[in-house]
């Protein structure tokens, strides 16, 4: 058999730079403003949906405005990307503050920036959060570019970056009839390229590391947490009813300011492989 390939194809797929992160836009707070917003109606046509995917791929998150404040809206958006992922919390979910739940998201307290499901071997790729009702004060949603934290630490604290790239950190969830455990580095690398950030002090489990590495590990954790909680790296916004926040859980750390009052949310997860598939189908890379 004989197969012919164009030079352009060979260069792009074999000879060229195949970095997964070539077109990502790493950001700090003062570098993104209105870039993150897109109207829900724009998602309903192919051109608008591609623009949405580009925002989500490049920045790691975006806010969809003018959504209907019902659970079905979350499902419609998830199904345009892939499908709703089932988890211990169900597929689609609605929630208000609830102290009886084991998960920290159900409280009114401040949530420091973290990624979800560090206790899962395959953490959700995307998370969708729709604000259905807000009669409260506070409760800002917080986004942090974990890839940019990785780049910053690699450039300025290479020894600490290496620690967080090589030590597996365990996560554990106990509740709702399950015990889930998994472990991976905070900075997961593939051929020296950062492909996933996993950081959650709420779900981190006990573990042992070599005594000589203990102090350095906690120094690295402290530096990561300092950067994630500095104003420079945080984008903050109080979600209004009808606004849906969607973000890449393998890249973006999310948090929430403390609040008082009523705040009702709806949401779901989508698998990373389905997000990547949608991007490839629409030529987003």
Residue ranges and their predicted role:
Residues 1-24:
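Hydrophobic, ordered structural segments
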């Amino acid at each position: 058999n004989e197969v012919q390939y164009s030079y352009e194809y060979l260069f792009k797929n074999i000879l060229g730079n195949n970095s997964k992160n070539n077109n990502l836009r790493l950001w700090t707070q003062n570098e993104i403003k209105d870039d993150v917003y897109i109207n829900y109606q724009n998602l309903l046509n192919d051109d608008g949906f591609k623009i949405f995917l580009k925002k989500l791929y490049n920045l790691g998150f975006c806010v969809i405005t003018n959504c209907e404040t019902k659970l079905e809206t979350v499902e419609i958006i998830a199904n345009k990307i892939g499908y709703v992922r089932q988890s211990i919390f169900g597929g689609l979910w609605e929630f208000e503050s609830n102290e009886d739940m084991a998960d920290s998201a159900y409280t009114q307290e401040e949530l420091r920036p973290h990624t979800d499901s560090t206790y899962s071997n395959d953490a959700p790729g995307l998370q969708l959060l729709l604000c259905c009702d807000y009669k409260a004060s506070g409760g800002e949603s917080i986004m942090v570019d974990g890839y940019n934290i990785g780049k910053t630490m690699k450039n300025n604290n290479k020894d600490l970056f290496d620690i967080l790239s090589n030590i597996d950190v365990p996560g554990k969830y106990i509740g709702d009839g399950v015990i889930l455990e998994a472990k991976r580095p905070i900075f997961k690398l593939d051929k020296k390229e950062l492909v996933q950030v996993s950081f959650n002090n709420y779900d981190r489990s006990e573990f042992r590391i070599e005594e000589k590495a203990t102090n350095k590990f906690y120094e690295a954790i402290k530096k990561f947490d300092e950067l994630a909680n500095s104003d420079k790296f945080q984008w903050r916004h109080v979600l209004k009813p009808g606004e849906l926040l969607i973000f890449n859980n393998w890249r973006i750390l999310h948090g929430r300011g403390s609040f008082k009052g009523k705040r009702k949310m709806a949401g779901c997860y989508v698998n990373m492989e389905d997000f990547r598939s949608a991007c490839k189908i629409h030529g987003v890379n």
